[in-house]
């Protein structure tokens, strides 16, 4: 497979690797981007890739809490200009409040909003503003108490990142602090039990290969038993601590894990939602000359 400059650029952006290292990784893996990331990591040339986070779409995430229930809704637009539009913001707020009454995105589209369905309201707003919009997803969470936080707030309850945290027990403010922590650290899951097993296994494979290659290149190689029973488990323990919410060091007090901070506050964190605008979406790229030609032809 031909390795293009764009492929090298994307790999460098996602891993922080040097240009020649990125090119070699893609060559060695026949252009497979995921395999190239793993190849770089086994060579110690890239950090662990967090869950897919390339953000290219515009829009807003809305969050809303009612008692022990919280919802997050993402609505995408084509441009950030529209995301700053008061009518668009009002629409997203309305969709978010409507989400409290339903359990999934299809039910939300059919939900009533001032005598019209959410879907009808969306289509009418598209016609007025003149830009395509998408009601992309919603998430709902519940507990004894739920706290919400928005990062890069555009208005009350609206922003580029929305977080919900559900706790068991009487919340004394810790849930909001944890929500802010989640916005910053982007954990993969609540606990080890909630992690995707394929993600854990992939990490184990990378760490095993890396440890074996480092040991083979060492002037004083360690016995295989040390690699298998000490080094690899130690690295996996670190991976789990860094990528699970309960295992992470609490940003507000790094002397405690999030689990320990919650316990001290007398609550148990039972779930969270972190929703970022455009997560996993790529904007359609168009050649500039083709774009100009298209504009002139139109």
Curated annotation (Swiss-Prot):
GO cellular component entries: cytoplasm
Q: Does the keyword Cell cycle apply?
A: no
Q: Which GO terms describe its molecular function?
A: translation elongation factor activity
Region of interest (Involved in Mg(2+) ion dislocation from EF-Tu), residue spans: 79-82
Keyword line: Cytoplasm, Elongation factor, Protein biosynthesis
Q: Which locations, inside or outside the cell, does it occupy?
A: Cytoplasm
**Hey, which family's this protein in?**
Belongs to the EF-Ts family.
Annotated function = Associates with the EF-Tu.GDP complex and induces the exchange of GDP to GTP. It remains bound to the aminoacyl-tRNA.EF-Tu.GTP complex up to the GTP hydrolysis stage on the ribosome.
Q: Which HAMAP family match?
A: EF_Ts (MF_00050)
The protein, known as: Elongation factor Ts
- Organism of derivation: Cereibacter sphaeroides (strain ATCC 17023 / DSM 158 / JCM 6121 / CCUG 31486 / LMG 2827 / NBRC 12203 / NCIMB 8253 / ATH 2.4.1.) (Rhodobacter sphaeroides)
- The gene name reads tsf
């Amino acid at each position: 497979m031909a390795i293009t400059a764009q492929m090298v650029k994307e790999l460098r952006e996602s891993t922080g690797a040097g240009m020649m290292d990125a090119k070699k990784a893609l060559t060695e893996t026949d252009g497979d981007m995921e395999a190239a990331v793993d190849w770089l990591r086994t060579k110690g040339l890239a950090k662990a890739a967090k869950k897919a986070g390339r953000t290219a779409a515009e829009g807003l995430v809305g969050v809303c809490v009612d008692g022990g229930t919280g919802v997050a809704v993402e609505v995408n637009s084509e441009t950030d200009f529209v995301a700053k539009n008061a009518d668009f913001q009002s629409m997203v707020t309305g969709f978010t409040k409507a989400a409290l009454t339903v359990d999934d995105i299809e039910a939300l589209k059919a939900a009533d909003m001032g005598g019209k369905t959410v879907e009808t309201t969306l289509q009418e707003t598209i016609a007025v503003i003149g830009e395509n919009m998408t009601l992309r997803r919603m998430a709902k969470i519940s507990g004894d108490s739920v706290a919400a936080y928005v990062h890069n707030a555009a208005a009350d309850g609206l922003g580029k990142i929305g977080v919900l945290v559900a706790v068991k027990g009487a919340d004394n403010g810790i849930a909001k602090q944890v929500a802010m922590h989640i916005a910053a650290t982007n954990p993969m899951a609540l606990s080890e039990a909630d992690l995707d097993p394929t993600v854990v296994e992939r990490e184990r494979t990378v760490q095993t290969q890396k440890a074996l290659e480092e040991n083979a290149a060492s002037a004083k190689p360690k016995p295989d038993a040390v690699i298998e029973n000490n080094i690899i488990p130690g690295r996996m323990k670190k991976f789990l601590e860094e990528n699970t919410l309960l295992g992470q060091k609490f940003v507000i007090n790094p002397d405690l894990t999030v689990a320990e901070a919650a316990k001290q506050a007398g609550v148990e964190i039972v779930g969270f939602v972190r929703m970022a605008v455009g997560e996993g979406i790529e904007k359609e790229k168009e050649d500039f000359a083709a774009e100009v030609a298209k504009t002139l032809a139109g």
